[in-house]
């Protein structure tokens, strides 16, 4: 194995690990957290916004910018990387991330399979969603029917309003998962709350902040929008 092949393989593993962590975070924060929140106290502004968002927005589309900051190593400063693209979702269980800069990458959950495609490496990784979620609190989120079921595994709290946004936090009670906490912020619009910021802190010390703009509530998607077919010639991995 030459150095280029080794470096490419290492890069592929790092990208897959990062994209999988992002997928789990999105299943937590966008597709699942709002299930059964009808009993949220009226004074909890961030939770109220989440409840209304989940009740009203069955589908959505937005542009996003993501900044991922890795913890600083001894003697070094923290490293950050920025990416951007288009995000779409259709509850329950389907979403699409089209990364356009700096690399073309696609992350698709079709309700059965989680697909991760790296155009630069011409590589596809396919995982069954149920297996991916099986060892995480997201498995409970996507099947919970009421707030009581969610409270068995998560602590929900409203955060103070900041910069004109309503904030809430969800913290897993289990200490062995990949996600330490999720912060979500909503912006008031004439069509109801719009998802504005998603901040994820993982167990590796990595912090991901996604800022959403040009949000559209309940757009109509084609039947094939969340389907994925590996490009001809792409390597397909099914770990």
Task: List where the protein language model places each region.
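N-terminal secretory signal peptides that target proteins for export/translocation
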Residues: 1-16
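Bacterial N-terminal signal peptides
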Residues: 13, 17, 21-38
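N-terminal leader/targeting segments and the immediate start of mature chains
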Residues: 34-78, 230-239
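Gly/Pro-enriched, hydrophobic low-complexity segments
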Residues: 45, 125, 149-239
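N-terminal mature ectodomain segment of secretory-pathway/periplasmic proteins
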Residues: 55-111
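A generic structural motif
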Residues: 65-71, 98-100, 117-119, 171-173, ...
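An acidic-aromatic
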Residues: 86-138, 208
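Short, solvent-exposed helix-to-loop capping segments enriched in aromatics
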Residues: 135-149
